[in-house]
Each structure stands twice: as structure tokens, then as C-alpha cells.
Amino acid sequence: MRTEKEIRGFLKQNGFGEEAAEEAVAMLKEYRYLDDERYCKEYFRYAKAKGRADGRIVKELAAKGVSPELARNAIEDARCEAEVDRGMAGASDFFGQPQTDDRALAMEIGEKMVRQQRENGKDRDEKFFARVGRRLAGLGYDSGTIYSVLGKLRQDERDRQRDY
């Protein structure tokens, strides 16, 4: 799948004029071969499976020529569809937060890194937690989410060491 901008760029790069490119895009849209909203939903599912944050997904879609508003709306629709597919429409945790929020996903990634580090018998020192933070930042999580996750992971680690 491609976005309208990507198709226009490809056609212009290969010698088609502005008018021909617009006609081709209009025809592709008419036959439903080209749909930026559907593209956003599919890209959201792909990017979430990779652990990316919503903000990063919106930026990546904007780079592909999708308006940020369309991207956010499509992401919200895709999230609702995913909840319905899982039979969790309206599901929320104790605090009323959606179960698919960025903090929960970031926490899963951090916990996985801690678990792998523990299984490999390696120390979980400040250097390690800095690496977790960089990983989360690379996935596009905001600093508040990262600090919150790191604080919880550090506290869990202190509690674990105190128990042993």
C-alpha cells in the first residue's frame, strides 16, 4: 500500500505530468485501490506491533504525506476496531486508562528488557536503565512516559533485591 503523496511522487519521478498524475490518483481512489485512511489504520497496526508510540506513528505518517489530523483520526478508529476485535470494547484498567495506552506498552517493553537482562545474569545498573530509556525514546515515547516507566522499573528492581 502507498499514500496519495507517494503515488504522485512516483509518477512525477517517472516522467508523468501533474495532470496525468492527478488523473491516475483520482482513478485509483475511485476504484478504492488508494485510501489514505485505510493506509493509516494498517500502518498503525504494523507500527504498534513494533512497539512504537502514537506520536512517532503520526510523525511517520506525516512524512509519508498524510495529514496529522487524518492520521490521528485513523489511529483512533484502528484502536477502537482492535478493541472490538478482541472483545474489549470499553475495557479499561483500574484507573480508567485504555489498556492499549503508550505507558502500558512502554512498560511491557521495559519489563521485557529487564527480564532478558536477568535471564542472562547481567547487572541491572543505571547504565542498563539508561539503555532502556534510550530504547523507549527511539520508539517515540515522550519523556514523561519514559521517566514514569524507568521509575517503576527501578522501584521493582529495588524491591526484588530487598527480598533476596
Model segments located where?
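An alpha-helical, amphipathic repeat domain used for nucleic-acid recognition
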Residues: 1-164
